[in-house]
C-alpha cells in the first residue's frame, strides 16, 4: 500500500496498515522533490562557508524528515512484532517529473544553464549514494527495512524519440 506521512496521524489508518499489509511504499516522501525541497539548502562548515564537493558544486543538505516519519513507524512496529514485520519498497531515486528543476542547473540555480552530462551523472550518483546511505547504510537505524528500490521511474515514454521537447529532463541531460 502507498501511504503518506500525514496519514499516520490517524490511528485507524495505522491500524489498517498493520493489520492488512506486509509491504508499504511512501507515496511521495522518498521522491527527489520532497528530499531536495523547493529551494536548495547547502551544507556549511564550522566557519559558515558553503561546503563544495569534488566537482565544485555546493553540497546539498537533504531533508529526510517526511520519509523518516514513515520509516520510524515501520521500525517501531517491526521491533514490537518480529514475527509480523512490514517492509518498505523505496520509491523512487530518480524521476524527471518530481525532481526540482534547479537540481539540473549550474550552481543549483533555477536561472542557471543546464549542466552537462558528466556533471549530471555525478550529481545523480552523489544523491543516490546519500539516500541509500541514510536508509540502508551501516549506521542507519532503518537498515534492512527497505527490501527493494525503484531506481528510475517512468524512464521510457513516447517523447523519448524527441528529448528536445523537455531539455531539463534526466533523459535529455544524459543522452
Task: State where each predicted segment sits.
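Boundary/entry segment of secreted carbohydrate-active catalytic domains
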Residues: 1-29
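Substrate-binding cleft and catalytic face of glycoside hydrolase catalytic domains
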Residues: 19-175
Amino acid at each position: 500500500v502507498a501511504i503518506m506521512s500525514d496519514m499516520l496521524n490517524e490511528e485507524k489508518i495505522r491500524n489498517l496498515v498493520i493489520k492488512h499489509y506486509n509491504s508499504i511504499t511512501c507515496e511521495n516522501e522518498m521522491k527527489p522533490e520532497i528530499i531536495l525541497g523547493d529551494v536548495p539548502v547547502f551544507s556549511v562548515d564550522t566557519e559558515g562557508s558553503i561546503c563544495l564537493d569534488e566537482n565544485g558544486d555546493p553540497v546539498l543538505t537533504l531533508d529526510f524528515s517526511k520519509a523518516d516519519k514513515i520509516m520510524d513507524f515501520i521500525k517501531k512496529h517491526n521491533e514490537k512484532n518480529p514475527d509480523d514485520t512490514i517492509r518498505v519498497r523505496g520509491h523512487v531515486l530518480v524521476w524527471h517529473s518530481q525532481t526540482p528543476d534547479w537540481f539540473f542547473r549550474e550552481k543549483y540555480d533555477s536561472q542557471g544553464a543546464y549542466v552537462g552530462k558528466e556533471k549530471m551523472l555525478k550529481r545523480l550518483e552523489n544523491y543516490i549514494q546519500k539516500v541509500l546511505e541514510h536508509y540502508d547504510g551501516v549506521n542507519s537505524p532503518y537498515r534492512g527495512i527497505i527490501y527493494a528500490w525503484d531506481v528510475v521511474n517512468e524512464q521510457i515514454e513516447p517523447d523519448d524519440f524527441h528529448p528536445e521537447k523537455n531539455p531539463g529532463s534526466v533523459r535529455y541531460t544524459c543522452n
